[in-house]
């Protein structure tokens, strides 16, 4: 959400991906983002996706999944996603290079680098479907879910 407007599609565009690591490396941006993300999770359970969620934002979360996959597979998936949304200009090689650049920048940045939390469960989804990934995550989270009848 941005100023009350749904922007999930827009933030997944390649032109945004090219700047994410650079902006995220800024200490002031990191501090404010962590503050806002923590505020969102204060009053209710939340599922959050991000490269430092389990280490900086919700270090005490009951369930943490560290998702990984073969870089080539990640690039192919991202390429297909972009193509399905009408981006016919980008090449698979450009997507691969973008992901490699982001991974390097995020793992080597000073503020909240991308690392696996010691207590995170590794989910290598290289050969898993989305449904298999969801089932894995639900199985790990189920003991912590409190559902009101």
Please report, for each region that a protein language model flagged, where it lies by residue.
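Glycine-rich phosphate-binding loop of ATP-dependent small-molecule kinases
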Residues: 1-14, 18-19, 130-149
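A ubiquitous short alpha-helical element
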Residues: 2, 63-67, 123
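ATP-dependent NMP and nucleoside kinases share a basic, alpha-helical "lid"
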Residues: 8-11, 17-24, 28-85
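Generic surface-pattern signal
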Residues: 21, 25, 100-104, 146
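Small-molecule kinase domains that catalyze NTP-dependent phosphoryl transfer to phosphate-bearing small molecules
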Residues: 37-43, 51, 55-56, 60, ...
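Short, glycine- and charge-enriched coil/turn segments that flank and shape catalytic ligand pockets
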Residues: 83-93, 145-149
């Amino acid at each position: 959400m941005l100023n009350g407007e749904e922007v999930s599609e827009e933030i997944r565009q390649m032109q945004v991906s090219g700047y994410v690591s650079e902006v995220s490396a800024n200490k002031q941006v990191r501090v404010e983002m962590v503050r806002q993300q923590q505020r969102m999770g204060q009053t209710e359970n939340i599922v959050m996706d991000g490269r430092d969620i389990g280490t900086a934002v919700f270090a005490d979360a009951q369930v943490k999944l560290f998702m990984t996959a073969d870089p080539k597979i990640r690039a192919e998936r991202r390429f297909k996603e972009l193509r399905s949304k009408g981006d016919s200009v980008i090449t698979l090689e450009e997507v691969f290079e973008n992901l490699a650049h982001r991974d390097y920048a995020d793992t080597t940045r000073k503020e909240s680098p991308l690392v696996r939390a010691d207590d995170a469960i590794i989910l290598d989804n290289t050969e898993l479907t989305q449904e298999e990934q969801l089932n894995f995550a639900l199985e790990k989270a189920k003991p912590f879910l409190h559902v009101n009848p």
